[in-house]
Amino acid sequence: LLDRLSNLAEETVIEIIDKIIENKIKFVDQNHHEATYANKIEKIDGKINWSESAELIQAKINALNPNPGGWFIFNNERYKILDADISSKYGQPGEVLDENLIIGCGNNSLKILKIQRQGKKPQNSKEFLLGSKIKPGTKLLNE
């Protein structure tokens, strides 16, 4: 998606520059009373709080992908969740519920589809669990 949007933006920027050169664009001042301010996205904004709803966590993962991404800390290592789906399973927030890497959230749970351990390559959940210390029953506390 990022690559497709990048290519689309490139074409659009070239088109807009051509129109500016040809004086075919009318500039309009911004209405400062209707404008809103968005804070700069910081790395800490991607930190996952497992007590939040699975929908909110999934939205955060999608919105902040690829950087800074939705992430959590376990045993002093950062794990970035690259893709996840909502699951109807219930468990304690932060608890790994089964071998499909389903993690309990505030209301239901999140099934992790793709994850990346700090300094490692992205993996699907099955590959990840084979070599991970994160197993069913593990509690991912909000460190």
Q: Residue locations for each model-derived region?
A:
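Active-site-proximal loop/hinge segments within enzyme catalytic domains
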Residues: 1-87
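An anion-binding loop in the catalytic cleft
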Residues: 51-143
